[in-house]
Amino acid sequence: MATSNPHESKVWLAAYAPGVPSEIDEVVETLPDMIEASVKTHGKAPALEFFGAVTSYRDLGDQIERAAEGLCRLGVVAGDRVALILPNCPQHVVAFYAVLRLGAIVVEHNPLYTPRELRHQFEDHEARFAIVWDKVYDVVDDFPQDVRPEQIVAVDMTEAFPWSKRVALRLPVAKARAARAKLTAKPRAKHPVSWASLVEGRRLPRRTPRPSVDDIALLQYTSGTTGSPKGAILTHGNLRANAMQGRAWVPGLREGEETFYGVLPLFHAYGMTLCLTFAMSIGARVVLFPTFDVSLVSDAAKKSPPTFLPAVPPIYDQLSRASAQGSIDLTSVRFAISGAMSLPVATVERWEEATGGLLVEGYGMTETSPVALGNPIGPSRRPGTVGVPFPSTEIRVVDPEDPSVDVEPGEPGELLIRGPQVFQGYWRRPGESADSLLEGGWVRSGDIVTVAPDGFVTIVDRLKELIITGGFNVSPTEVEETLQQHPDVADAAVVALPRRDGGEIVAAAVVLRPGATIDVTTLRDFCRTRLAAYKVPKRVFVVEDLPRSLIGKVLRREVRTRLLGEA
């Protein structure tokens, strides 16, 4: 074992693209400071585009101030947690920055979560206020009294559509009714607080106290390295630092001229940082999509061609196929950054042939706001690796059994990360915080890596037993507990199996109770009522028993080996 950190010399700096600094400046502004600077500098420029409707930075700033005042009238004060349960839409962006302007804390949620999943998170963070898509209003309204927020604001995202599209949705025809049902719903409550009423008042008084860089900005729920969902605490300084690191990483960005495509969900740390903070810090136009759809992207590209597209490999593959078929022109895309799951070299080749631009892989985790490493934007990038540490970011590679001990150069070990983007711990989880956040500010990644002599990092294994599917983390334990609730299931183990495109699927091995029989489709339907769709096992195998250790723990690696033999 090494006696000290072999990576202190930062040999990877030689691989940085020209103009990329080794360090970023000290963070001195909060996220509200950042967006206000963009409003001042790029006031007339487009900030958001949604189904063709464009919002300028000046109008965005005005809406943020009015929404902040509306939230203040509802009783939101600094330090309050405010839950957001919204798809990608302009109201999501406004709500995010309005909450932060008051010094309150944003808590992001997946609007496609089941009531059970949402309730678990609300029980943990105890938000007094929620701003929710009107289609999930009733879910939150039905929470037990001790969990339900005091105030729930209903958002009809179709109010942000252009006039012509709103009119089309009101047509008394089946197609319009079906489209409307997917996008909006009327809450059962007689007089819910509407988003429109929240933003129709005056602007927030300038004297209203402002948050500081060290204040908590966000609770972002993650399975972490242990599989149990918990809120990662991220400050204004953490999130602003990561936006600054992203800006420094990409040479040739044109302030006020780039067009980012928001195909990633803003409730995910990756989509949030790339499109809500990084993009808006440079005055970019952010084209928002409530869900990824090739035809929607194709239509938008005809009016506002994308120049910067953060996404995940399955999205790049779908768009590359569409380009090859002639249904979309991607040649405007200069920069594409992939994350959240491994990036196959074949995906890179197809994408770069379709666009003429670069597709590079980055690496991070919710606990690092989320980006910590990336491939250089230039000839020194290396497909198949996750690149090198970002500016102001340090790494260690340690013995996973004793993270105080560094491994020898080139040997595999657990990746540790330190930098201004590293989180502050988990909400109300001191034990798990201490396990993940080590002395000196190092965060454990749970990933086993090797580091090449020139500093490029390759992931070779995963300590944490999370499954990454479509860019989302799935806790095997959560899925196993759901399966075990079925009356015919005696035991279950959940693992990842490989997909042909290099990604992973959720697979389950189940042991039935004596005399029981079960239809796999029925079991998956059972899960679908309790879990978000991406967590539902794609493959289910009925087995006689599960391999266990001497102390009775299921050996998931052995389960995976068995299933690979049967798949």
Please provide the spans of the model-predicted regions.
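AMP-dependent adenylate-forming
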Residues: 7-13, 18, 33-56, 74
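Conserved AMP-binding/adenylate-forming core of the ANL superfamily
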Residues: 25-27, 44-89, 93-97, 114-119
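Conserved adenylate-forming
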Residues: 71-76, 202-214, 219-262, 282-284
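Structural core segment of the AMP-binding/adenylate-forming
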Residues: 73-74, 101-197, 514
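AMP-binding/adenylate-forming catalytic core of the ANL superfamily
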Residues: 113, 120, 130-132, 419, ...
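Conserved AMP-binding/adenylation subdomain of ANL enzymes
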Residues: 240-259, 267-308, 322-323
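Gly/Ser/Thr-rich phosphate-binding loop
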Residues: 306-311, 320-381, 394, 404
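Conserved ATP/PPi-binding loop(s) of AMP-dependent carboxylate-activating enzymes
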Residues: 388-392, 403-436, 474
